[in-house]
Amino acid sequence: MEGSGTEQKGSPKCSFLTNSLLCHENRQRLWRICNFIMFGFFSLAAYVQINDPDAEMWIVIYMIPAVLILFVSIKPDITGHVIWKLLADLHSAVCAVGAIYLSGCLYFYTSKNILHEEEGRELSGLLIISGWLLLCRKSHQSAIGAIRLIIAISVSTAPFFIWIYIYIDKEMRTSWPQHCKTVI
């Protein structure tokens, strides 16, 4: 209704065909969907660690962001809560330290594609965790902008494409350790 005072000045009306990504409600909806997709990714990543020799560590590493991101997909403003920020920052720091360690190992001991090495796949997972938690970090402070949304859509779909590539590449599967060959 025009003139009712309920419209926000400067924000386009929501409609499916026009301005769909520019509308605040649609950007917020896409942001929540991306977070739910990442919840699924982190949960699935935790599940496939079952056969890993150090499964306990990797299940925890993936389940912490899965739970944090599930909360974001349900209530995006949770990122402003001090406990959410503390857990996300602490976990990001731990993942960053692990990523630095694995990067060093890969740099000095690997000559192949890093995705062919278990440490390379672990490094990728740690970087995705840190990157996604960083992307969520200040999302409560302002409306989800187009750049953050484009990054979110790209990052939330990329792990699944990487998994498909890794799963389809027969050469890569031959170099997998035995515990990786019996998962999904």
UniProtKB/Swiss-Prot annotation:
Lineage top rank: taxon: Eukaryota
Signal peptide: none
Membrane topology listed for this record: Multi-pass membrane protein
Keywords: Membrane, Transmembrane, Transmembrane helix
Chief localization: membrane
The keyword Lipoprotein belongs to this UniProt entry's keyword annotation: no
Gene Ontology CC: one annotated term: membrane
Pfam family, one: TMEM220
Localization (cell): Membrane
Transmembrane stretches, start-end: 30-50, 54-74, 82-102, 121-137, 149-169
Keyword Translocase belongs to the record: no
Name of the protein: Transmembrane protein 220
Annotated source species: Xenopus laevis (African clawed frog)
